[in-house]
Amino acid sequence: MSERLDDLNDRREAALHAGSERAVKRQHDKGKMLARERIDYFLDDGSFHELDMLVRHRAHESGIEERPYTDGVITGWGTVDGRKVFVFSQDFTVFGGALGEVFAEKLHKVMDLATSVGAPMIGLNDGAGARIQEGVVSLDGYGGIFWRNVQASGVIPQISVILGPCAGGAVYSPAMTDFIFMVREKSHMFITGPDVVRTVTGEEVTLEELGGAGSHATKSGVASFVCDDERQVLDEVKVLLSYLPSNNLESAPVVAPQDDANRSCPELNDLMPDSPNLPYDMRTVIEVVLDNGEFLEYHDSWAQNIVCGYGRLNGRSVGVVGNQPMRFAGVLDMMASEKAARFVRTCDAFNIPLITFVDVPGFLPGVDQEHGGIIRHGAKLLYAYCEATVPRIQVITRKAYGGAYVVMDSKSVGSDLSLAWPSAELAVMGPQGAVEILHRRELEQSADPAARREELVDEYMEKFANPYVAAERGYVDDVIDPADTRIRLIAGLEMLATKHEELPRRKHGNVPL
């Protein structure tokens, strides 16, 4: 037995150092951690249990003579803050982290386990794509991964962390997960690289411009979160996990409250500008209301006219959506609608209550928006709210105009509780536009159109642009003192804690994609 144990230990040692010294040095010289170093940093100390440590490729006819253990990816399970998670970490020092048949089988196994056990699946991506030498077998492996991403969708949280290159077909697995994290100047995602783009289209573009973290954080909306280095990004994943349940049958962890549930927020009374046309920062409202001012913002650099993210109220996770008057007056456009729709559906999938702060003057007008599909994109957000069965509370802080008001989780689309500040303006449209339509002839015949227009705007504001007409009809459940917003939200969530709602039986809804 002693000899057999020695042999086992030798094999394990070889697996622990599967990459060559040269490849390891090259990885470190780039300022990047090794696959095992990432797992060790991310998981609780001593909690990692590895799967398939001793597997090797069997592509004997592919011309690959080396057969290192692990085959370029580390898989297994462990804990983060005491909670079970499954993880894979691509090893760029072995075959460049490229995916072959055995590599894919390892991912299939760990993904199946995560889904059946009901624990989050975390993918640490740093690889060169498909292993060309293994041909179509690699493509079949990717297909199995994509299929499993879809089977796990809405069942367990799936988080992709891009720590190096992720190109070609390899990008589609992260794209189907719930969240994508990237590192500035280290992470790159694209279907076709700069050389192919140059050859096919003649466009000159750098790697960073085409598929860097900055581009995906600000332009494409692919990156949910972006950090400065690997350790920071892994720490941020841990923070996100703290807001999420392990699966769709559980609730998110409850944290012992460190903030008074009965805390008043008097600063909110002084936040709103006197002029309805002046902006204020919706993030301030959100952070003042949440426990300890802690707010993990989702897509903070993309579609900034709407704010989405996670926080807690009295120790319980909530998803927060809010129009941002600081950007384009908080209008809804194509990107904002898509961003918020994705966020709302993710919260609903994982039993996280939704708080929606409304200050929306409407949908962004323009030929580009219409031709780009604002009708279809706006419908995504409307669909997401109508479909959501989690507790939903709406808070109208100022403007709530037209169809955009309805879309932003109004009572008519199923919000459980609608609260309004005294500054709220619920109307079909803004006063200027309404006056132009309702009184066009009168203004044309007026001796002083400007003065008469101002009078009519004031009349409209007094009669319609307030929360009380809606409150009289029950479209708003209560008009509240802004200072009481936190107190009222916590009370509302406690009341809704036992809410149970089921959608009609169907194969699946037809989201306007």
Predicted regions and their residues:
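Ligand-binding clefts of soluble mixed alpha/beta catalytic domains
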Residues: 1-513
